[in-house]
Amino acid sequence: MTTQAPPSALLPLNPEQLARLQAATTDLSPTQLAWVSGYFWGMLNQQPGTLAATPAPVAEMPGITLISASQTGNARRVAEALRDDLLAAKLSVTLVNAGDYKFKQIANEKLLVVVASTQGEGEPPEEAVALRKFLFSKKAPKLDNTAFAVFGLGDTSYEFFCQAGKDFDSKLAELGGERLLDRVDADVEYQAAAQEWRARVVDVLKARAPSASAAQVAVAATGAVNDVHSSPYTKEAPLSASLAVNQKITGRDSEKDVRHIEIDLGDSGLRYQPGDALGVWYQNDPELVKEIVELVWLKGTEPVTVNGKVLPLAEALQWHFELTVNTANIVENYATLTRSESLLPLVGDKAQLQHYAATTPIVDMLRFSPAQLDADALVGLLRPLTPRLYSIASSQAEVESEVHITVGAVRYEIEGRARAGGASSFLADRVEEEGEVRVFIEHNDNFRLPANPETPVIMIGPGTGIAPFRAFMQQRAADEAPGKNWLFFGNPHFTEDFLYQVEWQRYVKEGVLSRIDLAWSRDQKEKIYVQDKLREQGAELWRWINDGAHIYVCGDANCMAKDVEQALLEVIAEFGGMDAEAADEFLSELRVERRYQRDVY
């Protein structure tokens, strides 16, 4: 249902808060809306006189501040579980997204807990960039009266494992904070470590934090991070959906194989918004499983135990273990286990282990350094299979019970043997139309269209980074939003790699897309990228920014996102008449105001 908002002057909510409230309630029935209204009214009135009290009692309560700094949802889930544990222990706790945290109040925190994931080359999640920058700036206050604990989430397949958590932990201590507990760095399989850490945090805080009344506990619970996204389908309990369309959208001679994938959600009622991601559980290639099994002189029928169930080895490898991403830990453990003459020299050398893992898939490590393993030893080396996240390329305002994604199939060769990405090749090659795909929605409130439909939008998305902007334009078209829209897109070749070309041309013709700037890096001698187009259009870009435009960036975190940010800083400095430091501060303010949002990976 659609509700006409009252004039902003009458609202106690800012436009972004109002947009989140409207998004949270858009699919509720009248009965559900009435229940929600009564629920909030009841919480507000659990104590006599609360109704007339001034707002924001949570901020004034003494107690624990719990900051969630999440990129893919894992840190958020850990933080929410800890919040529930603390509330169950009748402790006063406020849970807040790092992006919503007023970081200048950190000097007033007495008990602070941070749950932080890491992305890219050791960088914090997008929602925590401003907080980290503040803590590492000259403006950071002394924290002599603050006690803190940090839980870091990461992936040992990356060089800068849990770096964001390490950075928060070291800086909070450097500023004078007292560690409640030593930092925990958790790998992809983080659940057991998180459960143990949560129990320790609760025990420590029981002796430090004030107890909360029932009313305070209820009010504190409203500080949860986006609990409004309720669905019976989750990462742990995904929806079994049906693959409807698998269409190659790059040309015959393109070096890239990019697929437009449409998945039918049926009558599941699964809802998403532009900016959200689709989680996809995949199965490994049976041929890869067979190759690995044969390389260690096994048959695949050997029994192994996975999550308490006994399965044949081949089935376990296909459904439950990560086979396409190697890590330094796997290399080191395999070298130690097999006493491999070629791998043992790498043990203890972090840089060499990391390089070997990044350039040598597990199957080729087994081929180059062969050894006979029993089934339990093999699975003991491996990490659990985890779902892949894809930026959603559709809006339900247009596609209703479907969800679309844009998938770049990962393909390469090692010594003449074809290798492929686990999830991308599953979607591109191994799922037939109407075949089953297990999916869930990973909501991302840090990548949202402006609440005001008149606000201009600047979208920067080379390669498959174009995906969420297709969703944005579908939504803006359906809403008949009057705000201007400007797209920057790039890829190697115009004739082979112009993803969704006909759709963008239609949006331009219809006036939905006000401007489009294209960068083809291989169509001329000099390579041209989207960041070059940003500089080229600097004066007009600055005019849009001055008119209140929101800037969105999607795609590669390691190179593109950094190059684009540098170009934006140069444009701001040149056309805004600022020095480098002032331009950096200006862009940081845009981020805090949610006018500069990134979905990078």
Swiss-Prot record:
Domain FAD-binding FR-type per the UniProt entry, residue ranges: 236-450
InterPro entries per UniProt: CysJ (IPR010199), CysJ-like_FAD-binding (IPR003097), CysJ_Proteobact (IPR029758), FAD-bd_FR_type (IPR017927), Flavdoxin-like (IPR001094), Flavodoxin/NO_synth (IPR008254), Flavoprot_Pyr_Nucl_cyt_Rdtase (IPR001709), Flavoprotein-like_sf (IPR029039)
Associated pathway: Sulfur metabolism; hydrogen sulfide biosynthesis; hydrogen sulfide from sulfite (NADPH route): step 1/1
GO biological process, one term: hydrogen sulfide biosynthetic process
Positions that bind FAD: 324, 358, 388-391, 406-408, 412, 421-424, 601
Subunit structure: Alpha(8)-beta(8). The alpha component is a flavoprotein, the beta component is a hemoprotein.
Function: Component of the sulfite reductase complex that catalyzes the 6-electron reduction of sulfite to sulfide. This is one of several activities required for the biosynthesis of L-cysteine from sulfate. The flavoprotein component catalyzes the electron flow from NADPH -> FAD -> FMN to the hemoprotein component.
Identification of the protein by name: Sulfite reductase [NADPH] flavoprotein alpha-component
Organism in which the protein naturally occurs: Citrobacter koseri (strain ATCC BAA-895 / CDC 4225-83 / SGSC4696)
